[in-house]
Amino acid sequence: MTIMRKTHPLMKMVNHAFIDLPAPSNISGWWNFGSLLGLCLIIQIASGLFLAMHYTPDTTTAFSSVTHICRDVNYGWLIRYMHANGASLFFICLYLHIGRGMYYGSYSYMETWNIGIILLFLTMATAFMGYVLPWGQMSFWGATVITNLLSAIPYIGTDLVEWIWGGFSVDKATLNRFFAFHFILPFIIAAMAMVHLLFLHETGSNNPLGIPSDCDKIPFHPYYTTKDFLGIVLLLAFFFTLVLFFPDLLGDPDNYSPANPLNTPPHIKPEWYFLFAYAILRSIPNKLGGVIALVLSILVLALLPHIQTAKQRSLMFRPISQFLFWLLVSDVFVLTWIGGQPVEPPFIIIGQIASLLYFTIILAFMPIAGLIENKMLKW
């Protein structure tokens, strides 16, 4: 008798992707974040669906509808905080996933890597639009400031901003369309994640050594399903600790005040996961230059496969590149801190140095280190 999972058209796809998939025998816990991101997406879509049942995308009632969810809906407060903190968790996993890809040279799988960058842009767009929906002070002013950046685009900028706003300022039309896009984008992200997996399974997973592992593969189930399950348990433990004990730890107190176009908050800043890019944006005095730097701060990842000079794929046996990688990680932490600070000395100069260092490490120091390490291999 044939096994159903190997013959049934639908089950066969699941089988090839999650059960009989040949996986390298030595992949570490850093490879858990793909499945954890899948879990985060499921949490966000499920909690978001229930929130959408009670939310009204209208400037007069949006803020009070969120209040109503927290006060009057059964476990509404839990769903709302799961959704808000789920976004933070999503980005923690996302940045760790990207960091692992950079450390172990996973960017050599160019199709998978490029789809990943598109996924990052889509997730950032979704999170930004979601932050606007509660219609608090930071929602309104964040939407105004960030959408206004598009006016820096020559010739079409102003028209583009007014087209996105649906008027001459951020108002009801903006909130309505942001809600529509915020609802549909996670499903597009889910579809793109499938494409991401499709490309990954064409080549097979990378491993910590960065060498071909065809001679030593093991089935995904039960080895990595159990390993992923452990990761999921740990992630959920951290997640519910955050949601139930410190729900407002990562939020902004200003967003508990209803949006008021006549009163500007003293420090307009996005959620913590955008602060590093926001710091890079602010470090350039020119508006168009800042917008270009902001986009490049993410788009620079697409250059990694093209500026790779080292003969070894992984950084595991490359001490100079390892030092530069951790310097880059530290630099991103500094940028995140600077993004949350007011625009005044000494934060301005620290932000400018950190921004310059960010691009210099990726575009210059890393390729040079690769060449030096190639020479060291011959000694």
Swiss-Prot record:
The chain crosses the membrane at residues 33-53, 77-98, 113-133, 178-198, 226-246, 288-308, 320-340, 347-367. The cytochrome bc1 complex contains 11 subunits: 3 respiratory subunits (MT-CYB, CYC1 and UQCRFS1), 2 core proteins (UQCRC1 and UQCRC2) and 6 low-molecular weight proteins (UQCRH/QCR6, UQCRB/QCR7, UQCRQ/QCR8, UQCR10/QCR9, UQCR11/QCR10 and a cleavage product of UQCRFS1). This cytochrome bc1 complex then forms a dimer. It comes from the Eukaryota. Its main location: mitochondrion. Component of the ubiquinol-cytochrome c reductase complex (complex III or cytochrome b-c1 complex) that is part of the mitochondrial respiratory chain. The b-c1 complex mediates electron transfer from ubiquinol to cytochrome c. Contributes to the generation of a proton gradient across the mitochondrial membrane that is then used for ATP synthesis. This is Cytochrome b. One of its GO terms (cellular component) is respiratory chain complex III. Its cofactor is heme b. Keywords: Electron transport, Heme, Iron, Membrane, Metal-binding, Mitochondrion, Mitochondrion inner membrane, Respiratory chain, Transmembrane, Transmembrane helix, Transport, Ubiquinone. Heme b b562 binds at residues 83, 182. Heme b b566 binds at residues 97, 196. A ubiquinone binds at residue 201. Belongs to the cytochrome b family. Heme 1 (or BL or b562) is low-potential and absorbs at about 562 nm, and heme 2 (or BH or b566) is high-potential and absorbs at about 566 nm. PANTHER family: CYTOCHROME B (PTHR19271:SF16). One of its GO terms (biological process) is mitochondrial electron transport, ubiquinol to cytochrome c. It is a multi-pass membrane protein. GO terms for molecular function: metal ion binding; ubiquinol-cytochrome-c reductase activity. It is found in: Mitochondrion inner membrane. Binds 2 heme b groups non-covalently. InterPro entries: Cyt_b/b6_C, Cyt_b/b6_C_sf, Cyt_b/b6_N, Cytb/b6-like_sf, Cytochrome_b, Cytochrome_b_C_euk/bac, Cytochrome_b_N_euk/bac, Di-haem_cyt_TM.
